[in-house]
Amino acid sequence: MQPWRFIRITDAALRRRIHALVEQERPRTAAALGERAQEFLALKVEGILECAELLVVALGDDRDKHVFGRRTLPQMDLASVSCAIQNLWLAARAEGLGMGWVSLFEPRPLAELLGLPDGAEPVAILCLGPVPEFPDRPALELDGWATPRPLAEFVCENRWAQPQLP
């Protein structure tokens, strides 16, 4: 009952078109970042062109047919595909491969480019392959886009915002 599909991109011209869609989105995202716009634009998304494997992950068009959990939690299909991506990421890392999740794209043009059926939507572009190293901290942290926070900020006891006791 997987509501998702992994699409392996093997056509070089298609890979370039996907890269172009991401490049179209970059200035829009930069504009939304305000004072960090130029810093963001310095980040490259060349992995789409250079990675060993390029995958696009999409939610299927028939996902409403799977009713377990979706009646009360309609977002379970997104949770399911996120778990699938995370599992791939963990497996890749265990095999010594790197993976990057690109989310800078408008879903509709990418769906049209890949011939997704009505109701299906892309949720991720994944760049997978060998990497020169695995830094000891996440790239977003190393580049100053994220700051590590203690687990206690994310784990509550019995109620929201009730910090877990040590």
Regions found by a protein language model. Name each.
Residues 29, 120-126:
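Short hydrophobic/aromatic-enriched beta-strand-loop microsegments
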Residues 59, 104, 130:
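Short secondary-structure boundary segments
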Residues 125-166:
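C-terminal helix-cap and adjacent tail motif
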Residues 1-4, 94, 123:
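Short secondary-structure junction motifs
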Residues 110-122:
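Short, electropositive alpha-helical surface patch
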Residues 1-81:
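Glycine/small-residue-rich phosphate/adenosyl-binding loop
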